[in-house]
From Swiss-Prot:
The gene is pafA. Keywords: ATP-binding, Ligase, Magnesium, Metal-binding, Nucleotide-binding, Ubl conjugation pathway. Catalyzes the covalent attachment of the prokaryotic ubiquitin-like protein modifier Pup to the proteasomal substrate proteins, thereby targeting them for proteasomal degradation. This tagging system is termed pupylation. The ligation reaction involves the side-chain carboxylate of the C-terminal glutamate of Pup and the side-chain amino group of a substrate lysine. It comes from the Bacteria. It comes from Brachybacterium faecium (strain ATCC 43885 / DSM 4810 / JCM 11609 / LMG 19847 / NBRC 14762 / NCIMB 9860 / 6-10). Belongs to the Pup ligase/Pup deamidase family. Pup-conjugating enzyme subfamily. GO terms for molecular function: ATP binding; ligase activity, forming carbon-nitrogen bonds; magnesium ion binding; ubiquitin-like protein transferase activity. The reaction mechanism probably proceeds via the activation of Pup by phosphorylation of its C-terminal glutamate, which is then subject to nucleophilic attack by the substrate lysine, resulting in an isopeptide bond and the release of phosphate as a good leaving group. Pathway: Protein degradation; proteasomal Pup-dependent pathway; Protein modification; protein pupylation. PANTHER family: PUP DEAMIDASE/DEPUPYLASE, PUP--PROTEIN LIGASE. This is Pup--protein ligase. The keyword Ligase applies. The active site is at D58. It catalyses: ATP + [prokaryotic ubiquitin-like protein]-L-glutamate + [protein]-L-lysine = ADP + phosphate + N(6)-([prokaryotic ubiquitin-like protein]-gamma-L-glutamyl)-[protein]-L-lysine. GO terms for biological process: modification-dependent protein catabolic process; proteasomal protein catabolic process; protein pupylation.
């Protein structure tokens, strides 16, 4: 599939604390306060926005944002950043309301994957694949790539080995920097579950499109990344690997003996050279898997994707050579590795110190006034590829080259004219009696007569009515 639609779902960590750092509100209460404007706008904590994205409160009081369908990976990054901005404003407004009510409380939203209590949050990637392809063949080739790509696209973090049974906490092993903390929360290679037995690839068959033509590949192993370069690489490299697999040509035989053991071993080896047992009885390394896939997909990349290959290679080389000079200002794991070691050395503490844990959380805070990552961007120590105008435009404008364009048109028109409506990924409908739903099962559709008729119906039904003000966005 040369042209592919994809999307990103991000679960945010939510905490509400007093000025002294103690908990001010339980997550459920904080979530209710956070979503108050959302519920006021859509009478629900689950809404689709003018940019065709979905903003909602997931199970467990996790705020979540799902981008609209994108067929350009930089547009996906812009749409993802737009979600960060919207949630950051919701958090700031909620904090202001709490202060006006006399409460010492600040709501923080964290774009990370593990909190201080060990709770895990997801960053789920979605890729459109052809139903006629051999979906059961995908994991065999895709899993080694997904297990090892953390050496380039991981968010980085610190783990401390648990003490032996019955041993005191102080006897736990030394804290260690890893490519990805998410790796410790994967329990299966392939499964239809998403939480209790969290897999690398989720196989639940929900295509959000014509089920006779399409299937949705749901990858839930990824880290939530603050760096635009890291986020872009996650999608652009995976897309290239999928194209190679779909081509039907000979592929690198890199199947691993135990994907879950391998993903944990790769996370802890910052040299990328730990021997990983393969299914055929041999061994490989994370660097070898990534390099072989990069070399293999080169022929599938067009001229506009040469920068993806170059950036991918620079990421691999940063691990292979140990020279982090480029990676430490572009890739999340390397930015954090340098930052954490600098702070630990300056304070005379090890990586297991609570100050480093607080620094990790602050790095992933999406509030630009609180975020360590945003501070690094302002100092030129972290990448800022997309200009502000593009991110701001993505807050209210859906991608124009996918089905999202149609959904965005309907939501925008309905909100502007005060017309009640219900939409989801495939269906658009007004909520008046007798209204017929319009289905858009082709994710690539940007024009549809039935949608044009629905837009005319919205305008006609609102004739003479005052326009509604724009909702939060």
């Amino acid at each position: 599939m040369k042209r592919r639609v994809g999307g990103l779902e991000t679960e945010y960590g939510l905490v509400c604390v007093r000025a002294d750092g103690s908990r001010a509100l339980e997550p459920e209460a904080a979530a209710r306060e956070l979503f108050r404007p959302v519920v006021a706008m859509g009478r629900s904590s689950n809404v689709f926005l003018r940019n065709a994205a979905r903003l909602y409160l997931d199970v467990g009081s996790h705020p979540e944002y799902a981008t609209a369908e994108c067929d350009d990976w930089w547009e996906l990054v812009a749409q993802d950043r737009a979600g960060d901005r919207m949630f950051a404003e919701l958090a700031a407004e909620a904090t202001e309301r709490l202060a006006a009510d006399g409460q010492d409380a600040r709501i923080h939203l964290l774009k990370n994957n593990v909190d201080s209590a060990g709770n895990a949050f997801g960053s789920h990637e979605n890729y459109l694949v052809d139903r006629r392809g051999e979906f059961t063949r995908l994991p065999r080739y895709l899993l080694p790539f997904l297990v090892t790509r953390q050496i380039v696209t991981g968010a980085g973090g610190v783990v401390r080995p648990a003490p032996a049974d019955g041993a005191p906490e102080q006897e736990a092993g030394p804290a260690q920097f890893v490519f990805s903390r998410r790796s410790d929360h994967m329990w299966e290679a392939v499964s239809s579950a998403t939480t209790r037995t969290r897999p690398i690839i989720n196989t639940r068959d929900e295509p959000h499109g014509d089920p006779t033509r399409f299937r949705r590949l749901h990858v839930i192993v990824g880290d939530s990344t603050m760096s635009e370069v890291s986020t872009h690489l996650r999608f652009a490299t995976t897309d290239l690997v999928l194209r190679a697999i779909e081509s039907g040509r000979a592929l690198p035989e890199l199947a691993l003996h135990d994907d879950i053991a391998a993903i944990r071993a790769v996370a802890r080896d910052l040299t990328g050279t730990t021997a990983i047992p393969t299914a055929d009885g041999g061994t490989t390394t994370a660097i070898e898997v990534q390099q072989r896939w990069l070399d293999h997909v080169t022929e599938f990349a067009d001229e506009s994707e040469q920068d993806v290959l170059e950036t991918w290679q620079r990421g691999i080389d940063a691990v292979r050579t140990g020279d982090r000079s480029w990676a430490a200002t572009h890739l999340d794991w390397a930015i954090k590795e340098r930052l954490f070691h600098q702070v630990a050395e300056r304070r005379g503490v090890d990586l297991g110190d609570p100050a480093i844990e607080r620094l990790d959380l602050a790095y992933h805070d999406i509030d630009p006034t609180q975020s360590v990552f945003a501070a690094l961007q302002r100092r030129g120590l972290a990448p800022q590829v997309l200009d502000e105008q593009r991110i701001e435009r993505a807050r209210t404008t859906a991608p124009t080259t996918t089905r999202a364009h149609l959904r965005g048109q309907v939501v925008t028109a309905a909100q502007e004219h005060g017309v009640d409506h219900v939409v989801d990924w495939t269906t658009l409908r007004l909520t008046r009696p007798g209204a017929m739903p319009v289905q858009v099962l082709d994710p690539f559709a940007t024009e549809l007569p039935a949608v044009d008729a629905l837009l005319e119906e919205i305008r006609a039904s609102a004739a003479g009515a005052p326009e509604s003000p724009p909702p939060f966005a």
